[in-house]
């Protein structure tokens, strides 16, 4: 029985090897077109470091990922300009949590509520 297993494996291995050889011999249409174009235009190989456009973009540096990033940066610039224009404003918010004793008393409303009556 073990001899039968070895014989059954041999055709599978040979078929895998034959498949690899067939793949090497058969060229996809894209590869054949690429070979034709390389033969026709030998000087147009891929440039080292990518295309000129990509190189320019990388040198320039990307400022914003999308319009949201642009708007956030724009708002920060406006906030910086406003803070430099009014430096005497000393009111700081968010430093402490208010308690009922810290809050001012409510003023009575001038208009009587229709629900209270």
Curated annotation (Swiss-Prot):
Main localization, broad class: cytoplasm
Region called Disordered, residue ranges: 1-52, 79-117
PTM characteristics: Phosphorylation at Ser-67 by gwl during mitosis is essential for interaction with PPP2R2D (PR55-delta) and subsequent inactivation of PP2A.
Swiss-Prot/TrEMBL GO biological process terms: cell division; G2/M transition of mitotic cell cycle; mitotic cell cycle
Claim: Endoplasmic reticulum is one of the keywords in the record: no
Phosphoserine: residues bearing it: 28, 67, 109
InterPro entries: Endosulphine (IPR006760)
Superkingdom of source: Eukaryota
Molecular function via GO: phosphatase inhibitor activity; protein phosphatase 2A binding; protein phosphatase inhibitor activity; protein phosphatase regulator activity
CC terms in the record's Gene Ontology section: cytoplasm
Comp. bias (Basic and acidic residues): 1-37
Compartment(s): Cytoplasm
Subunit description: Interacts (when phosphorylated at Ser-67) with ppp2r2d.
Name assigned to this protein: cAMP-regulated phosphoprotein 19
Species name: Xenopus tropicalis
Organism lineage string: Eukaryota, Metazoa, Chordata, Craniata, Vertebrata
């Amino acid at each position: 029985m073990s001899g039968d297993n070895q014989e059954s494996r041999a055709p599978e291995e040979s078929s895998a090897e034959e498949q690899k050889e067939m793949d090497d011999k058969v060229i996809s249409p894209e590869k054949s077109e690429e070979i034709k174009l390389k033969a026709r235009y030998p000087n147009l190989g891929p440039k080292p470091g990518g295309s000129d456009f990509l190189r320019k973009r990388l040198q320039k540096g990307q400022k914003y990922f999308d319009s949201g990033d642009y708007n956030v940066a724009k708002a920060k610039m406006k906030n910086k300009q406003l803070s430099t224009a009014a430096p005497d404003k000393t009111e700081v918010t968010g430093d402490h949590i208010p308690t009922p004793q810290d809050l001012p008393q409510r003023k009575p409303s001038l208009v009587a509520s229709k629900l209270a009556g």
